[in-house]
Structure formats: structure tokens, C-alpha cells
């Protein structure tokens, strides 16, 4: 059982009888994970904290408390408290519902199964039951549930292939190797007899650092990162491994690089807070003005009117008392229902997202999931997208596609795999290139570190490099099949006959060399050959001189241009025949370099240089790193929508640049500004230089992108360099950040958020993306693949990257436009009604008397005008989905209609004008209170109820006026709300006064109002007269600043009416400019294949690749060197079962 940590290090006993209920088992972190925002203890304080970050909630709490002061409130004691409690309850239920969804997602991960050794037998348990010190078995293609110490594996020498793309984004597999003293424990019986003590460093977030000792029989052995298997990584090409659990749950390196789910609030919420602060000061000013008016009126009238003398010494007539009274009277200028209306609207908007059949993926049987609804509007304001590469943009599937040999360019781009029968035909017919065909296929089958495995009669290739595996499979498809590896030789089936090829030496691949070589003896006593594969830049300069090779390079270059235009990963193959004497002279020098301690790297490089020269070019290959479906088209559409896309990946620079081109993030004429320095001073100077270059390119209107690696980023994010980095990054059309740690991704996201002050969206599929997903304004996880960490930590989950286009362009644009209307409309209708109290105060001696019945004041928001903003937020379609998907430029025009101060001021101004119109027209209509044929009058409440009715009608018609598409729910809600008020007046005035005296003032009011023809005429005339202002303004805005919907409609009709529109636009240069921009953008955003590029563009692409290397994926920091791997593997040995 594990013991407690006796010092800063962690001490773990292995192999003793384990009692899961023992107290020591509780000293380490549980393996249960949680991404929930709340728990049973934190819900109330955290929920209240989140709610009272909204200033309107603080305001209404204060009003509810003030109303409890006796006689200070003209509207009653509970007219604010009751609605406020209802609103908080609705918000709490919504938060609980969404957090339950997160908990279910966590439980899905916690319930993954794993085999744990118990009493010498493998017992299947859940991930959450894994404890420190457990022995566990992981089978091929399974995820590691915790950080493990590798003890043994099914492979020779205790080796295991690990896929870490979920952690660092790298496509190549890592090779881990168990210590020799534990690698022999290949059965549960041996493992159950094993006993030792582990001492290792405490949990840390450094994924590339780990040290510890394991003590067996009194002898301590050191282990390190080469023996550590991280949670979230996946076992590949290895039947099984045994591991000892070192770190669990939130102590694991993966989760230490993640953050607790943050409390995110949208930009609109922040802006709404500022608007509420503004209205609060307006409210205070009105209260002070009204209290001052009261003081003036009292001073002028009380001394002259003997019947008012009792008010002279009344404490309730003080200025402060008046301020409080008017403050409460006008408090509804700030809409109490705004938050609950938004909560309801956002909740159902999230349901729309969840049920959008257009975002359903058949292959993974998964759909889009809105894990929070608070950020729906943020989807419509995105300016930056930070995307992971591996698994998000790419499938991490390599396909051998093309082959260049001499003047022949074999293969095509349409087939999924290499398919060209003419290759074999040319070889069999003795074509002039037949020798090269045979040699390049043999090189593809021999020059690598792949290990073959015969499983059920089928060859399976295990490789740390997916590129190498793709080449070996490609050779096998062309009848040169590699099937056996032994320490000193490989056996290949070459066109039906087995050939044994002796491996004499291996010169390892490194990123500096950009090549790998093997020296082979072709058959018993055959020729010695040097096979070298690598980047075109390093291969071409090592070829022998002569016209023949110059022609070969010319043909190869032409083919490489073709491959570059499709974003393929290219590799050149060359060879050289060696004499026995040449090899025997060189081999001792190379072996001496291998054994050297000092200057080993230089000695190895010098030895390689002596041999890798005067070679002949055999051919070149093209490998496709397959993108996810519709990735180039999606990125094109997003960029057409004025969104900047960044790629943040842990993969190599060359691979990242290659994918940036193939997914249309960078084009072939995009100038790459590469920052790859190792010191702060160099990084600072390079950034400063590139800022000047960027300014120059902007003037020339040329495209440019920045590429920066993780080491340079460490310096770029510190000190004065941070300013230059931010300046350069925000100027670039695209940015590629490679070799990044999870926390660096998060730091970049946070930097862009602060500097750009725009909405940043982060999207990824792996556990290494969790930190940046949580750091972004909006986090999107890919849910279609196994490993749910990213999806669980995200705000929105989608099955595939290309669904991001619909999520932003359709749901984002719609939700943003709808929510802005909901907020503005809520402010508008409240000011429209409650500012009437100010106008009435002028005619009521500034007494603080309300013109409306007290309970109808509270019910205005929660009942009579509750539905129009809801249907506006759910059913309004500002632009049809088909149009905005076809013309992404419309998305940017929605952002131009943001929640601006100007737009807010317009709505507030109209609300004040409407309230003036409604009050004074109503007052004028009933000025002498003679509204019946018999001369009876109705009193002040009659005036208030009539004005109330006209306000309800006006704000409902206003909702119809602001709606871009009249659907039946919108019409029913608006007309129905007017009818609801009429019905309420009838019921309230006839029934409630007889139930405990509720609403006694309203007794008989329905009969009084509805028996007057003046009321019915005014109900028809006054709202229409009031809304004439809006009709005039909307007409002017349609001409001067048309909406995105209007622009799209005009664009669709351009063939018949565009000339007429041009003439109309002559009255407004603003419209003309908008139309030109939109038209050019729409024409430029039609999605087509990004791979239709000109020859000159392809040439530029090749030039870039020759400057920056190639995209060959090979792990050069493996626990097992390539030479050692080749020398230690014997694929003919039988593997242990581990059972």
C-alpha cells in the first residue's frame, strides 16, 4: 500500500497486500476527476458571487431592502423582493441543470474501465477506483488512467509505443522503455511477487521532467521521463504494458496543466453592467430632481394652503425621505426581468444548438452540445480562433500518395491511397527507370525503424513515425513487402521472392541533419549500399555532379512543386554504392564516434558527412497528413468572416507549417516570419525586426504570417519582448505556434484576450488543450473522438471541426443579434412605462404618488411584456442560415451592429419620446375626465390604467417592428400580450377586490374603461402615432445603414436591380461602400478547393519549404535510439501474453 510522503518527495510501497480502506490510501489524491463549477458546499456562495457580479442584481437587492422601511415605498414592500427571488431561483435551476450535464460527462470519464492486479489476478475496475501504488494492465489502443511507471511490456526489452498527440499534439509515437530489472515481470504471477519502494519527486506540471528511484532487494535504480507514462496518452502498437500508479487524479501532470472551470461571463453581460450603471446614475439624478421639485412645491404651497399645514412638520416630507421615495418609485427603469429573460432565452438557444441536425456526425453518432448557455452571444463576436492541430484539423492518419522517379510522376490526388498500376508495369517491362523503381521501393521497405508483426495472418507495422509506417505500407502495396526484422537483418518479399538484406549500420535521423541513412548489404555477399532519405535541401546538395543528376533534380523539383501545391509532406531518396574498402575504412571511425563521450554529436556528424556524399537521386515521395473533413473550406469561410485563425500545437515546426498550407491557413504567397531563437536578446531583436517588416508588408498589402516555437515563446511572453510579440501577432493574418506546452497555449490565449480586447475562441480535442479552452472567452471541444477531457472542459462541444462554421456563422450571429435585441428591448419597455411616473409627478405635486396600481407595476415585466422579448430571442431570423453559410462576410456585419453606445442611446431616446407621447396624448384625451355620455369621470387610476394599456400595446407593436422575420410565435406573443392585459383587467377588477381586499382600487375598473368609446379609439390611435417616430427612423436607416439581411437580399437580386441600387446609394456613400465591401467579400468567400493553385504559387510553396525544411515525423528524443531499436528487435520471437 502507498505510504505517506515523509518529506517533499513521494514514497510509494509496491507489492504489499493492499487494503483500499486503509487510512494511508487517503493520503494521495483520488483518481476521480471533476470539471464541474459547483459542489454541494460551494454552490450557494459561488452562485451568489456569480449573480451579484451583475450590478442589476445588487441594485434590486438594495431596492428590496429599502422597501422594507415602513411608509417609504409608494409601491408596497414585496413588489421587488418576490420577483427578485423568482429570478434568482430560475437562474439557480439553470446553473444546476448545466452543472449536472458536466457531472455526467465527468462520470463518463471516471467510469472508463481498467484492469488492476488484485491477489494475483487482473480485475476490471473503473478509472476512479485507481489508487497510487496499484499495478495496472493497459492493452493496445487504450488510454492511461493515471501517471504510471512502466514496469514491463509485450515488446522486447520492455519497449512500448506511446501516442501523446492528446497531450502535446505531436503526431509521431514516443518509445518508452522499462528498466531491465522490471522488464522481465511479464506475467501477473511474477508481478504479484514483486516488492519494492519508489521514491520520486512530488507532483508537478512539467511534462518533460521526472526523476525517481526504485529500490529492489536493497539496490536502488534511477528512473526518469523515459519510464513515465502520462495520463491521457495512449498505448499504440504494443499489445500490453504493466505499470505502477505514481500520480492520480489532479496530481497527474495532465490535470496539473489544467485549471478549474472558470466562471465566464460574456462581453454583452459586461456591457450590460455598464449600461445599468449609467441608468443607475440617471435614476439617482431623477430621484434628486423629483425630491427637489417636492421641496420647491412644498415651500410654495404649504404656507398658502391652511389645509396642508399638517404637512409642515411631517418627517416624511424631508428631502432625504423624498429621495428614497422617488428612488423606489423610479427603480423599475432598470428592468428586473432582464436577467431571467436572458436566462430563459439562452437556455432555449442552447437547446437549438443541441438539436441542430446540421451539426450531427453520423460516424461518431454525436451532435453539438452546449455545455453552458451564458456565452451564446459570444459565438457571434469571435475575432480570434486558437486551434489545436492534431485531431482537430488533422486526423493523424498518413497516406502514401505520390511517387517521383526520374521524369515519371506516379499516383494521383483523387485516390485515398497510392494507386498507379503503371509503376509496376514500367518495372516489369524494363523501363529506363526500372532500376530506380526497384531501389526506391526497397529503400521505402528498409530505411526505417518500423517493426513488423504478423497478427492473424496480417502484417501490422509498429512505428514511432507515422510517416515511416505509411512508406512501408506504400512499398508493400507495390509488391515490396517488409515482413521480418532481426537484429542484423531484415527480410522483404520483393515481387514474390524473399530477399534478406543485412543492416550494417544506421545513421540516426535528427532535426539538424534532416535525414536518416542505413548501410546495407544486398543479399549474401552482395553489394554494399548507402540508402539515405531526407529533405530535398539536404539531399540535393549531396548528389554527385553531372548532367544526369542535374536533369534528375530538375524533374524532381517540378514534381515537388506539384506536391507542395497540395500540402503533402515530401521526402527525397538517394543512394550510393560503396566498395568493401570504402566501408571498412569508414566503419571503425563511425563506431568510435558512437562510443565517444566528449564531442559525440560532432564526431557522429563528421563521420556521416564523409559517407553521405556523391549520391544519386533515386526518387521522392509525397505523404498526405489527412485533414479532417472540410477543414480548408471551413477556415476559408471563417477568414472571410473577418476572423483570424491561429494554430497552436505541440508538434514540430515543419509539420505545423505544412498543415498550415494544406488547410488554407497560409497560402503559397504568404510570407512566413519565423521566430526560432533561444535567448531573450535574440528573440527580442527578431521580433523588433519582424514588426518593422510587418508594417512594410501591410503598406504593400501582402499577406504574412508568424511562426514561433515554444522556446522562443518563453522569451516572447516576458519583459519588453511581450509588447513586440503582441504587436506582431495582432498584425499577422495567421499565426502558427509550435512545440508548445499546454500552459503556453493558455498564456497565448490570455495575452491575445488582453491585448486585442476581442472575443477569443479556443478549439481542441485533447487533454493538452484544456488549459487554453478554459482560458479563452469561448472554449470549444471536439467530442467525436475518444478521450473526453477537452469536451468535458469546454463551453461547447462539436463532433468535427467543420461544424464550427455553422456554430459561429449561424448560431453565433443569430444569438448575438437576438440577445442584443432582448436587452435593448427590455431597457426600452421599462423606460417607456416607468418614466411616465416622472411626467405624472409634475402633475401630482411631486408627491411620490404612483399613477399605476401597485401590483400591475410589478407584473408589467413578469407577465404582460414577458413574452415579446423571449420570442424575439428565440424565433427572430435576422438572416437565413443558408445565406450566411454561403456568404460568411455577413458575420462581420453582425458584429458592426454590436451593443454600441450609439445603438443603446437610440433605443433609450426613443423610449423617452414614446413615454412623452403616451402620457401626454393620454392626458390630453382625458384632460377633463369627461369620457362617458352621461358625464361621469374616472379619476387618476383611470388615467393610469389607460396609459398602461397604451404602453403595453405600443411596446408589443414595437417588438413586431424590430423583428426581422415575422414567425407565428412572434405574432402570437405580441398580440397575445395585449389580450392578456385586457383579460387581466377584467378578472382583477371583478374578482380580486372581493378576495381579501386585494386590489381594492381596481374594483369596477374594467367596466369603467371598456364602456368608453374614447378608450377604444385612443387604443387604436395613440400607439400608432407613437410608433411613427420608429417608422421614419427605420426607413432612414434602411437607406443609410442597411442590415445584413437587407444587404444579402440586395446582393441576391443584383442581376435585376443592382443598377437601381447604385442610383439609390448615390444618396448615401456609406451604403455604397458597405455594398462594395460585402459584394467583394461574398465573391471571395465562395468555397472551393483550396488546392487549385497556379504553378507560380506552387513554386513559391516549394521555395518556402526549401527554406524551412520538410515535414518528416520522427521521434529523435526517444528512450530507445534508432540504432538500438533496430539492433534489439527480433520480430520472429513469440511475445508474452501478460496473462
UniProtKB/Swiss-Prot annotation:
Active-site residues, as the UniProt record annotates them: 388 (4-aspartylphosphate intermediate)
Any Pfam family hit: Cation_ATPase
SUPFAM superfamilies documented for this protein: Calcium ATPase, transduction domain A, Calcium ATPase, transmembrane domain M, HAD-like, Metal cation-transporting ATPase, ATP-binding domain N
Enzyme Commission no: 7.6.2.1
MF-aspect GO terms: ATP binding; ATP hydrolysis activity; ATPase-coupled intramembrane lipid transporter activity; magnesium ion binding; phosphatidylserine floppase activity
Deleted gene: phenotype: Results in abnormal formation of intestinal vacuoles.
Keyword terms of this UniProt record: ATP-binding, Cell membrane, Endosome, Magnesium, Membrane, Metal-binding, Nucleotide-binding, Translocase, Transmembrane, Transmembrane helix
InterPro entries the record matches: ATPase_P-typ_cyto_dom_N, ATPase_P-typ_P_site, ATPase_P-typ_TM_dom_sf, ATPase_P-typ_transduc_dom_A_sf, HAD-like_sf, HAD_sf, P-type_ATPase_IV, P-type_ATPase_N
Coiled coil residues, start to end: none
Compartments where located: Cell membrane; Early endosome membrane; Recycling endosome membrane
Function (record text): Transports phosphatidylserine from the outer to the inner leaflet of the plasma membrane, thereby maintaining the enrichment of this phospholipid in the inner leaflet. Ectopic exposure of phosphatidylserine on the cell surface may result in removal of living cells by neighboring phagocytes. Regulation of the phosphatidylserine distribution in plasma membranes is likely to help in the maintenance and control of the membrane surface charge.
Protein name: Phospholipid-transporting ATPase tat-1
Species assigned in the record: Caenorhabditis elegans
High-level lineage: Eukaryota, Metazoa, Ecdysozoa, Nematoda, Chromadorea
Gene: tat-1
Amino acid at each position: 500500500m502507498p505510504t505517506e510522503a515523509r518529506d517533499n518527495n513521494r514514497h510509494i510501497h509496491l507489492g504489499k497486500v493492499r487494503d483500499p480502506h486503509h487510512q494511508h490510501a487517503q493520503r494521495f489524491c483520488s483518481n476521480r476527476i471533476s470539471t464541474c463549477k459547483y459542489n454541494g458546499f460551494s454552490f450557494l456562495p459561488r452562485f451568489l458571487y456569480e449573480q451579484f457580479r451583475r450590478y442589476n442584481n445588487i441594485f434590486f437587492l438594495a431596492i428590496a431592502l429599502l422597501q422594507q422601511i415602513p411608509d417609504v415605498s409608494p409601491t408596497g414592500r414585496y413588489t421587488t423582493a418576490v420577483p427578485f427571488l423568482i429570478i434568482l431561483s430560475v437562474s439557480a435551476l439553470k446553473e444546476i441543470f448545466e452543472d449536472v450535464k458536466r457531472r455526467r460527462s465527468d462520470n463518463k470519464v471516471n467510469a472508463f474501465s481498467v484492469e488492476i492486479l488484485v491477489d494475483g489476478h487482473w480485475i476490471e475496475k473503473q478509472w476512479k477506483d485507481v489508487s497510487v501504488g496499484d499495478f495496472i494492465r493497459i492493452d493496445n489502443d487504450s488510454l492511461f488512467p493515471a501517471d504510471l511507471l512502466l514496469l514491463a511490456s509485450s515488446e522486447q526489452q520492455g519497449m512500448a509505443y506511446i501516442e501523446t498527440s492528446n497531450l502535446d499534439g505531436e503526431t509521431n509515437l514516443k518509445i518508452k522503455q522499462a528498466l531491465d530489472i522490471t522488464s522481465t515481470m511479464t506475467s501477473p504471477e511474477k508481478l504479484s511477487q514483486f516488492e519494492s519502494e519508489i521514491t520520486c519527486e512530488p507532483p508537478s506540471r512539467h511534462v518533460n521532467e521526472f526523476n525517481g528511484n526504485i529500490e529492489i532487494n536493497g539496490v536502488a535504480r534511477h528512473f526518469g521521463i523515459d519510464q513515465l507514462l502520462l495520463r491521457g496518452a495512449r498505448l499504440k502498437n504494443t499489445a500490453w504494458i504493466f505499470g505502477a500508479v505514481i500520480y492520480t487524479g489532479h496530481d497527474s501532470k495532465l490535470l496539473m496543466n489544467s485549471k478549474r472551470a472558470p466562471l465566464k461571463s460574456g462581453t454583452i453581460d459586461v456591457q450590460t453592467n455598464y449600461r445599468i450603471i449609467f441608468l443607475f446614475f440617471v435614476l439617482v439624478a431623477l430621484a434628486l430632481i423629483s425630491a427637489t421639485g417636492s421641496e420647491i412645491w412644498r415651500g410654495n404651497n404649504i404656507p398658502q394652503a391652511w389645509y396642508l399645514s399638517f404637512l409642515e412638520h411631517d418627517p416624511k416630507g424631508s428631502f432625504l425621505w423624498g429621495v428614497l421615495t422617488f428612488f423606489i418609485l423610479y427603480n423599475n427603469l432598470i428592468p428586473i426581468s432582464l436577467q431571467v429573460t436572458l436566462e430563459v432565452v439562452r437556455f432555449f438557444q442552447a437547446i437549438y444548438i443541441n438539436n441542430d441536425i446540421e451539426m450531427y456526425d453520423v460516424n461518431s453518432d454525436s451532435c453539438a452540445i452546449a455545455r453552458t448557455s451564458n456565452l451564446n452571444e459570444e459565438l457571434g463576436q469571435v475575432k480570434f480562433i486558437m486551434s489545436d492541430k492534431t485531431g482537430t484539423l488533422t486526423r493523424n492518419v498518413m497516406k502514401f500518395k505520390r511517387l517521383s522517379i526520374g521524369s515519371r510522376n506516379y499516383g494521383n490526388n483523387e485516390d485515398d491511397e497510392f494507386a498507379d498500376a503503371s509503376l509496376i508495369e514500367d518495372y516489369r517491362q524494363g523501363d529506363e527507370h526500372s532500376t530506380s523503381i526497384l531501389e526506391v521501393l526497397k529503400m521505402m521497405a528498409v530505411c526505417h525503424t518500423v517493426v513488423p508483426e504478423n497478427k492473424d495472418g496480417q502484417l501490422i507495422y509498429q512505428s514511432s513515425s507515422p510517416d515511416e509506417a505509411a512508406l512501408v505500407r506504400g512499398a508493400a502495396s507495390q509488391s515490396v513487402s517488409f515482413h521480418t526484422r532481426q537484429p542484423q537483418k531484415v527480410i522483404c518479399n520483393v515481387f514474390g521472392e524473399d530477399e534478406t538484406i543485412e543492416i550494417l549500420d544506421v545513421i540516426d535521423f535528427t532535426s539538424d541533419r534532416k535525414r536518416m541513412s542505413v548501410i546495407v548489404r544486398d543479399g549474401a555477399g552482395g553489394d554494399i549500399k548507402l540508402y539515405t532519405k531526407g529533405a530535398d535541401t539536404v539531399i540535393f546538395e549531396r548528389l554527385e555532379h553531372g548532367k544526369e543528376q542535374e536533369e534528375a533534380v530538375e524533374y524532381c523539383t517540378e514534381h515537388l512543386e506539384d506536391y507542395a501545391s497540395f500540402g503533402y509532406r515530401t521526402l527525397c531518396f538517394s543512394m550510393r554504392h560503396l566498395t568493401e574498402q570504402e566501408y571498412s575504412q569508414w566503419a571503425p571511425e563511425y563506431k568510435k564516434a558512437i562510443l565517444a563521450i566528449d564531442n559525440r554529436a560532432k564526431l557522429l556528424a563528421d563521420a556521416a558527412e564523409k559517407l553521405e556524399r556523391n549520391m544519386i537521386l533515386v526518387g521522392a515521395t509525397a505523404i498526405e497528413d489527412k485533414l479532417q473533413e472540410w477543414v480548408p473550406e471551413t477556415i476559408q469561410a471563417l477568414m472571410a468572416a473577418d476572423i483570424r485563425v491561429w494554430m497552436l500545437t505541440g508538434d514540430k515546426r515543419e509539420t505545423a507549417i505544412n498543415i498550415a498550407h494544406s488547410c488554407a491557413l497560409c497560402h503559397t504567397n504568404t510570407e512566413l516570419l519565423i521566430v526560432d531563437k533561444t535567448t531573450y536578446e535574440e528573440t527580442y531583436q527578431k521580433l523588433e525586426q519582424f514588426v518593422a517588416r510587418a508594417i512594410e508588408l501591410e503598406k504593400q498589402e501582402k499577406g504574412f504570417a508568424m511562426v514561433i516555437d515554444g522556446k522562443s515563446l518563453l522569451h516572447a511572453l516576458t519583459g519588453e519582448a511581450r509588447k513586440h510579440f503582441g504587436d506582431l501577432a495582432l498584425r499577422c493574418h495567421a499565426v502558427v505556434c509550435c512545440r508548445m506546452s499546454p500552459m503556453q497555449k493558455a498564456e497565448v490565449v490570455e495575452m491575445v484576450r488582453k491585448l486585442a480586447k476581442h472575443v477569443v475562441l479556443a478549439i481542441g480535442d485533447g487533454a493538452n488543450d484544456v488549459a487554453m479552452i478554459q482560458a479563452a472567452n469561448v472554449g470549444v471541444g471536439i467530442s467525436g473522438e475518444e478521450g473526453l477531457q477537452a469536451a468535458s472542459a469546454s463551453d461547447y462541444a462539436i463532433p468535427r471541426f467543420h461544424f464550427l462554421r455553422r456554430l459561429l456563422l449561424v448560431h453565433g450571429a443569430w444569438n448575438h443579434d437576438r440577445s442584443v435585441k432582448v436587452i435593448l428591448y427590455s431597457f426600452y419597455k421599462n423606460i417607456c412605462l416607468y418614466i411616465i411616473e416622472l411626467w405624472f409627478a409634475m402633475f401630482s405635486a411631486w408627491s411620490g404618488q404612483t399613477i399605476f396600481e401597485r401590483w400591475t407595476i410589478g407584473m408589467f415585466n413578469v407577465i404582460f411584456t414577458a413574452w415579446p422579448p423571449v420570442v424575439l430571442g428565440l424565433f427572430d431570423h435576422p438572416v437565413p442560415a443558408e445565406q450566411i453559410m454561403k456568404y460568411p462576410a455577413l458575420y462581420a456585419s453582425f458584429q458592426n451592429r454590436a451593443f454600441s453606445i450609439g445603438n443603446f442611446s437610440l433605443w433609450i431616446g426613443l423610449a423617452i419620446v414614446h413615454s412623452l407621447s403616451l402620457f401626454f396624448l393620454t392626458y390630453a384625451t382625458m384632460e377633463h375626465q369627461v369620457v362617458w355620455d352621461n358625464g361621469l369621470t374616472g379619476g387618476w387610476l383611470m388615467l393610469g390604467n389607460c396609459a398602461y394599456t397604451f404602453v403595453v400595446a405600443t411596446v408589443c407593436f414595437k417588438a413586431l417592428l424590430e423583428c426581422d422575420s415575422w414567425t407565428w410565435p412572434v405574432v402570437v406573443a405580441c398580440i397575445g400580450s395585449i389580450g392578456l392585459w385586457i383579460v387581466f383587467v377584467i378578472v382583477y377588477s371583478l374578482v380580486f377586490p372581493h378576495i381579501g381586499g386585494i386590489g381594492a382600487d381596481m374594483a369596477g375598473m374594467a367596466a369603467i374603461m371598456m364602456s368608453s368609446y374614447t378608450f377604444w379609439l385612443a387604443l387604436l390611435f395613440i400607439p400608432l402615432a407613437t410608433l411613427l417616430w420608429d417608422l421614419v427612423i427605420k426607413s432612414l436607416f434602411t437607406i443609410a445603414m442597411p442590415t445584413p439581411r437587407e444587404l444579402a437580399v440586395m446582393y441576391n437580386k443584383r442581376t435585376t436591380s443592382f443598377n437601381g441600387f447604385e442610383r439609390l446609394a448615390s444618396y448615401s456613400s456609406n451604403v455604397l461602400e458597405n455594398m462594395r465591401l460585402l459584394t467583394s467579400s461574398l465573391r471571395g468567400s465562395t468555397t472551393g478547393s483550396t488546392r487549385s493553385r497556379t504553378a507560380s504559387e506552387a513554386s513559391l510553396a516549394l521555395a518556402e519549404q526549401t527554406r524551412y525544411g520538410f515535414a518528416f515525423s520522427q521521434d529523435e528524443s526517444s528512450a530507445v535510439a534508432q540504432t538500438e531499436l533496430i539492433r534489439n528487435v527480433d520480430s520472429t520471437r513469440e511475445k508474452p501474453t501478460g496473462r
